[in-house]
């Protein structure tokens, strides 16, 4: 079967039209795609917010500042002599501590507080906690693991014992 020039022109026209339609579909999808697929979320979970209401007066009684959800990489650094600097940094860059107590004047980190719950009983979380505990120990910063609920007085005593 031999195609005439007219048949070839029609075939090329159909292919061109198909490519045009596919290009338009791609363009419309791209323009519709939200470049900012983000939404606001609460800074603290309900459990964390409840604990914060107990922690805040305990910290105020000791004249301490409370910071929340601080990345480990913001409160500790990889030793400059570490050969595998990036590997060590990558281990701390995406982990955070629930609450940090600091000196309000110097902002020196005095203590970390992890609010534990049932998720800390999972194998991956236990492994993560062991690593974080070791990193805090290496930096000489006390790290408390606490469970909610707790009274302000109980927490105040626990903080004073470990500072």
Question: Residue locations for each model-derived region?
Answer:
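A short, structure-level motif marking secondary-structure boundaries and short turns
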Residues: 36-40, 116-119, 161-162
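N-terminal signal-anchor transmembrane alpha helix of single-pass membrane proteins
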Residues: 1-34
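Basic, amphipathic alpha-helical patches used to engage nucleic acids or provide basic targeting signals
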Residues: 97, 104-158
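Active-site metal-binding core of divalent-cation-utilizing nuclease and nuclease-like domains
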Residues: 68-110
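Charged, low-complexity surface patches
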Residues: 44, 48, 102, 124-126
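Surface-exposed alpha-helical segments enriched in charged/polar residues
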Residues: 53-57, 134, 160
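N-terminal topogenic membrane-targeting module
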Residues: 25-83
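Short low-complexity, flexible loop/linker segments enriched in glycine and/or proline
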Residues: 83, 154-163
């Amino acid at each position: 079967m031999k195609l005439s020039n007219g048949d070839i022109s029609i075939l090329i026209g159909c292919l061109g039209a198909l490519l045009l339609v596919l290009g338009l579909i791609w363009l419309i999808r791209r323009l519709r795609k939200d470049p900012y697929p983000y939404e606001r979320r609460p800074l603290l979970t309900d459990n964390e917010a409840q604990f914060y209401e107990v922690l805040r007066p305990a910290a105020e009684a000791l004249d301490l500042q409370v910071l929340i959800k601080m990345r480990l990489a913001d409160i500790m650094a990889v030793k400059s002599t570490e050969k595998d600097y990036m590997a060590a940094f990558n281990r701390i860059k995406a982990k955070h501590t629930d609450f940090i107590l600091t000196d309000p004047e110097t902002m020196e980190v005095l203590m970390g507080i992890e609010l534990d719950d049932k998720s800390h009983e999972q194998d991956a979380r236990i492994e993560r906690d062991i690593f974080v505990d070791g990193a805090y120990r290496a930096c000489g910063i006390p790290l408390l693991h606490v469970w909610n609920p707790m009274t302000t007085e109980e927490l105040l005593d626990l903080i004073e014992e470990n500072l």
